[in-house]
């Protein structure tokens, strides 16, 4: 799960007309002709450098570039989110110049200073995850990229500095943290509950920090919060075995509801259950067991096939006896999660179900005019908009929000499908998505979001470039065509790295 870096509703974001953001057609034509894995990997590198150069020219050291106006954004506290989020991708691409630029920047960050509210979740997955990943990669398989190892050590030092700034968030009666905090006053937003994903997507990064530093406090804080999610109460919080509610009371750790989904707000809790098992199957066997229960219950209770396209599979939501037939781009990580769990646990049923989910999410790309999927969609026959009946009859779904803000989840699951099956079709799906993003989102200085993926030219443009373009979209596309390496996802139990929800790979403990 990633919140948009802009807090306004998508309909109210800064828009420009398509004419102001036409793609660079010469590049588009060159990309479309790339056939070999090497040429495709190089095309992704070019896109990364294009976006990086625009960010450095117009927005550094701010958090985001506004890639149409060439303005800046500071949605992530002004610490240079795009730079930190780009580090692990630059390392994997072997770009020594950019890696060292980012290391020099990270050494200058003062994480104790910001004028804005801090999100514990977003700061953990982007900044802490990005620095820990850079450390693991540069101390290991990419150590040749940095001559001065003191720069690499700074990544771990700054990770600990950041965690020390954030850790007061866990100082609550239950240990369930506040998410929205003021690091200057040690205050919070007064929330009485925290979300499932926001609470349950800290444990990988904070545990890795403890394992690297030898200071167990960070792991203990995140794992204490996670324990409430692994052992939910009351019973109504777990309507199906392994599937739990969406909100947890900060005062006592009890769940406040039994609303179940894999959508944004819940998603990465389930993602991290199996990833913690991959990180260390001995220490986190319970996490793996809980993921299996959630996966089995999802297949049994949440799998949903659109009336007009029974060949497609999506995951519905559930609340108090009612099913919600709607989903999101965010949810499309689910295929990759089932594929990872299936290969690690040697469960062919999970692999097959994961591929079914991947096929469904691919169709949300395949059926739009741009070949890019929407922010949200539904398949409830009672709720089909009158102007989308043709789409619903043909595709089996209708679009609830046609925005695309450079999200990675569909490409992410295509990547997992490629790595775990070896079937070329999934690489082609990745490539097609990348070509279309280049065609419709590329600007003179970076990449912009789209207002309507099912309109000519993608509708208007959002004048914002999320940091996860660097961290996730371009990384997963590049990895799909890059040579094998120990940071690549592996079949079976051979993974040397595991990816956090921002696509930052950290070395497994086992």
UniProtKB/Swiss-Prot annotation:
- Cellular compartments per GO CC: cytoplasmic vesicle lumen; endoplasmic reticulum; membrane
Which co-factors does it depend on?
Answer: Ca(2+); Mg(2+)
- Which pairs of positions does the record mark as disulfide bonds? 332-361
The UniProt annotation places Ca(2+) binding at 501
The pathway to which it is assigned is: Protein modification; protein glycosylation
**Reaction equation(s) it catalyzes:** N(4)-(alpha-D-Man-(1->2)-alpha-D-Man-(1->2)-alpha-D-Man-(1->3)-[alpha-D-Man-(1->2)-alpha-D-Man-(1->3)-[alpha-D-Man-(1->2)-alpha-D-Man-(1->6)]-alpha-D-Man-(1->6)]-beta-D-Man-(1->4)-beta-D-GlcNAc-(1->4)-beta-D-GlcNAc)-L-asparaginyl-[protein] (N-glucan mannose isomer 9A1,2,3B1,2,3) + 4 H2O = N(4)-(alpha-D-Man-(1->3)-[alpha-D-Man-(1->3)-[alpha-D-Man-(1->6)]-alpha-D-Man-(1->6)]-beta-D-Man-(1->4)-beta-D-GlcNAc-(1->4)-beta-D-GlcNAc)-L-asparaginyl-[protein] (N-glucan mannose isomer 5A1,2) + 4 beta-D-mannose; N(4)-(alpha-D-Man-(1->2)-alpha-D-Man-(1->2)-alpha-D-Man-(1->3)-[alpha-D-Man-(1->3)-[alpha-D-Man-(1->2)-alpha-D-Man-(1->6)]-alpha-D-Man-(1->6)]-beta-D-Man-(1->4)-beta-D-GlcNAc-(1->4)-beta-D-GlcNAc)-L-asparaginyl-[protein] (N-glucan mannose isomer 8A1,2,3B1,3) + 3 H2O = N(4)-(alpha-D-Man-(1->3)-[alpha-D-Man-(1->3)-[alpha-D-Man-(1->6)]-alpha-D-Man-(1->6)]-beta-D-Man-(1->4)-beta-D-GlcNAc-(1->4)-beta-D-GlcNAc)-L-asparaginyl-[protein] (N-glucan mannose isomer 5A1,2) + 3 beta-D-mannose
Which residues, renumbered to this chain, are glycosylated? 35, 95, 182, 249, 366
Q: What EC designation does it have?
A: 3.2.1.113
Q: How does activity depend on pH?
A: Optimum pH is 5.5. Activity is above 50 percent between pH 4.5 and 6.5.
**What GO molecular function annotation could you give as one example from this UniProt entry?**
calcium ion binding
> Per the UniProt entry, how does temperature affect activity?
Optimum temperature is 45 degrees Celsius. Activity remains at about 60 percent and 14 percent at 60 degrees Celsius and 65 degrees Celsius respectively.
Tell me the SUPFAM superfamilies matching this sequence: Seven-hairpin glycosidases
For biological process, the GO terms are: carbohydrate metabolic process; ERAD pathway; protein glycosylation
Look up the signal peptide feature and give its range: 1-21
The record's cofactor note says:
Ca(2+). Can also use Mg(2+), but with lower efficiency.
Keywords from UniProt, A to Z, are: Carbohydrate metabolism, Cytoplasmic vesicle, Disulfide bond, Glycoprotein, Glycosidase, Hydrolase, Metal-binding, Signal
Q: Pfam families under this entry?
A: Glyco_hydro_47 (PF01532)
Q: Where in the cell is it found?
A: Cytoplasmic vesicle lumen
Q: What family, per the record?
A: Belongs to the glycosyl hydrolase 47 family.
Q: How does it assemble?
A: Monomer.
**Name listed for the protein in its UniProt record:** Mannosyl-oligosaccharide alpha-1,2-mannosidase 1B
Q: Which gene encodes it?
A: mns1B
């Amino acid at each position: 799960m990633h919140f948009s870096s802009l807090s306004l509703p998508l309909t109210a974001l800064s828009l420009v007309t398509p004419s102001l953001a036409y793609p660079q057609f010469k590049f588009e034509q060159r990309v479309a002709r790339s056939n070999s894995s090497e040429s495709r990997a190089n095309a992704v590198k070019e896109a990364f450098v294009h976006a990086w150069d625009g960010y450095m020219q117009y927005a550094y050291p701010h958090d985001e570039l506004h890639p149409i106006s060439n303005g800046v954004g500071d949605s992530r506290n002004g610490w240079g989110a795009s730079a930190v989020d780009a580090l692990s991708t630059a390392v994997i691409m072997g770009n020594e110049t950019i890696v060292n630029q980012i290391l020099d920047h990270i050494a200058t960050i003062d994480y104790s200073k910001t004028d804005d509210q801090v999100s514990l979740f977003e700061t953990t997955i982007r900044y802490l995850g990005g620095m820990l990943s850079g450390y693991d990669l540069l101390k290991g398989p990419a150590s040749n990229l940095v001559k001065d190892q003191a720069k690499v050590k700074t990544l771990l030092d700054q990770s600990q500095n950041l965690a020390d700034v954030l850790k007061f968030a866990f100082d609550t009666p239950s240990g369930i943290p506040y998410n929205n905090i003021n690091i200057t006053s040690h205050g919070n937003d007064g929330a009485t509950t925290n979300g499932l994903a926001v609470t349950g997507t800290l444990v990988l990064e904070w545990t890795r920090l403890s394992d690297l530093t030898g200071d167990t406090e960070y792991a203990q804080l995140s794992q204490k919060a996670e324990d409430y999610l692994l052992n939910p109460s009351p019973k109504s919080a777990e309507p199906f075995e392994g599937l739990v509610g969406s909100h947890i009371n900060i005062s006592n750790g009890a769940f406040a509801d039994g609303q179940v989904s894999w959508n944004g707000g819940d998603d990465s809790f389930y993602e991290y259950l199996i990833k913690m098992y991959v990180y260390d199957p001995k220490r986190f066997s319970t996490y793996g067991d809980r993921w299996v229960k959630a996966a089995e219950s999802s297949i049994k209770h949440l799998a949903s096939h659109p009336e007009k396209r029974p060949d497609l599979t999506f995951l519905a939501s559930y609340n108090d006896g009612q099913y919600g037939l709607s989903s999101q781009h965010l949810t499309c990580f689910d295929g990759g999660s089932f594929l990872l769990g299936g290969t690690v646990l040697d469960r062919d049923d999970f692999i097959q179900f994961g591929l079914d989910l991947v096929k469904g999410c691919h169709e949300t790309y395949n059926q739009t005019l741009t070949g890019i999927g929407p922010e949200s969609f539904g398949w409830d026959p009672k709720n089909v908009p009158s102007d989308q009946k043709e789409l619903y009859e043909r595709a089996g779904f209708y679009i609830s929000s046609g925005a695309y803000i450079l999200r990675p989840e569909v490409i992410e699951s295509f990547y997992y499908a490629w790595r775990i099956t070896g079937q070329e079709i999934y690489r082609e799906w990745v490539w097609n998505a990348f070509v279309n993003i280049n065609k419709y989102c590329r600007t003179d200085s970076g990449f912009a979001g789209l207002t309507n993926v099912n309109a000519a030219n993608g509708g208007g443009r959002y004048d914002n470039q999320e940091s996860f373009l660097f961290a996730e979209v371009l990384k997963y596309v590049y990895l799909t065509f890059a040579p094998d390496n120990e940071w690549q996802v592996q079949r079976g139990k051979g993974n040397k790295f595991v990816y956090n929800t921002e696509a930052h790979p950290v070395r497994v403990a086992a």
